């Protein structure tokens, strides 16, 4: 991500002092890691992400589980357990927006609570009670919320 931020901040037509990163699902976890590692990031948002995806593999349905071998290699459960925000959250000090669906058993809002408890900066958490994973059924509400938050924060 730092190489992308390098490219963006080198452009004359962009304000390099107003860099935000964000991600959905796994991307949200890595957006927080980027904010912790790169001081040029001024805000971060994440949607339907995890503190760690550890334990998810065993709970996946029979259609989803085989695809995880493509993403995570021969031992998906071990690889998922190694992906974590432990020791990272406290190093990120910029504002964080977390947006979750209340009807998302794969990445429930309890992950937002765990992230917020360790995060090093201000945290805003919004939960759409009927929202599913990655908020596909409430994007018409979540997208403007994220855009407005970014405009206000940056």
Residue spans for each PLM region:
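Short beta-strand/loop motif that positions the catalytic acidic residue
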Residues: 91-93, 98-100, 104
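Alpha/beta-hydrolase fold nucleophile elbow
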Residues: 12-25
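Alpha/beta-hydrolase active-site loop
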Residues: 1-13, 33
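Glycine-rich nucleophile elbow surrounding the catalytic serine of serine-hydrolase chemistry
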Residues: 23-33
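Conserved alpha/beta-hydrolase "acid-adjacent" motif
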Residues: 105-111
């Amino acid at each position: 991500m730092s190489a992308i931020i390098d490219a963006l901040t080198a452009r004359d037509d962009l304000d390099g002092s107003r860099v935000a990163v964000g991600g959905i699902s796994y991307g949200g976890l890595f957006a927080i890691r980027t904010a912790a590692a790169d001081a040029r990031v001024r805000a971060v948002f994440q949607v339907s992400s995890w503190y760690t995806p550890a334990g998810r593999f065993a709970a996946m349905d029979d259609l989803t589980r085989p695809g995880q071998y493509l993403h995570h290699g021969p031992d998906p459960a071990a690889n998922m357990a190694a992906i974590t925000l432990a020791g990272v959250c406290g190093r990120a000090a910029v504002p964080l927006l977390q947006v979750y669906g209340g009807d998302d058993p794969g990445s429930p809002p309890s992950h937002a609570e765990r992230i917020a408890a360790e995060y090093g900066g201000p945290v805003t958490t919004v939960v759409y009670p009927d929202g599913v994973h990655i908020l596909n059924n409430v994007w018409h509400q979540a997208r403007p919320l994220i855009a407005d938050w970014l405009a206000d924060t940056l």
